[in-house]
Amino acid sequence: MDKYTAVKRTFEENQDQENAVKMAKYMRDLFVFYGIPTPKRKKLYRDFLKGEGKNKTIDWGFLDRCYDDEHREFQYLVADYLSALN
């Protein structure tokens, strides 16, 4: 399973529809959300980012796929990924 699919599956398994509606409304329905609060979201991919940080190479293909996903959590992941590799 590729990185994008693994992260997507993790987000889908931890989604909260009630929070997703609230988050979308807060952002004036400009984005679709899984409804995962920031602390939980960051915890879900903490180990993944640690592993990526050891590579010392940015996987731009992975980041492009994440950023193109309609769910806002993926765009947050891109920012956190780049910060972790900085």
Question: Where do the language-model regions lie?
Answer:
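Surface-facing alpha-helical segments and adjacent helix-coil boundary elements at the starts of domains
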Residues: 1-86
